[in-house]
């Protein structure tokens, strides 16, 4: 029976926990790492250690921030307060920033609603979102959510929850394929989606 050394089996096992990584890919990556120089492996190990120690979220928008700074770079910078873009994950913010079409503020929900699995948005996160809207007083709230059932459910929920606001609510439309996650959308497509957003 095939049996790898314990250190290699453990590495393959951890790599398989990453989304989209099956056994074959994890095995290939593990053997690739075996060929790395000692200093490269130590640098990688240091990066993982820093990730576990320094990872933190901005108290204003819940994007990732550098430790020990009090806010993320987007909340620190002098950005347009007339627009607030709501996303599901911090990685969505970086996708939108690469498209270079949005200059306003962000807010991260942390998840999308999923009626099938019972996943919901935390009450505290919604309370802080409303607080953020009150503070910024934006003219437009943009729902930059995945074009999936979960994204649709979340957009409908937010439209109802934020109906009290005087801000107009829009959602990205043009260029976002149905059923596709933000992870697979290029910056050009995102730019078109932003330009062609519709009232929601």
From Swiss-Prot:
Highest rank taxon of the organism: Bacteria
InterPro entries: DNA_Rcmb_RecR (IPR000093), Rcmb_RecR (IPR023627), TOPRIM_dom (IPR006171), TOPRIM_RecR (IPR034137)
Molecular functions (GO terms): DNA binding; zinc ion binding
Zinc finger (C4-type): 58-75
Keyword Zinc included in the entry's annotation: yes
Record-level GO BP terms: DNA recombination; DNA repair
Domain Toprim: 82-177
Keyword line: DNA damage, DNA recombination, DNA repair, Metal-binding, Zinc, Zinc-finger
Pfam family, one: Toprim_4
HAMAP family linked: RecR
Entry's family note: Belongs to the RecR family.
Function statement: May play a role in DNA repair. It seems to be involved in an RecBC-independent recombinational process of DNA repair. It may act with RecF and RecO.
Protein name: Recombination protein RecR
Gene behind this protein: recR
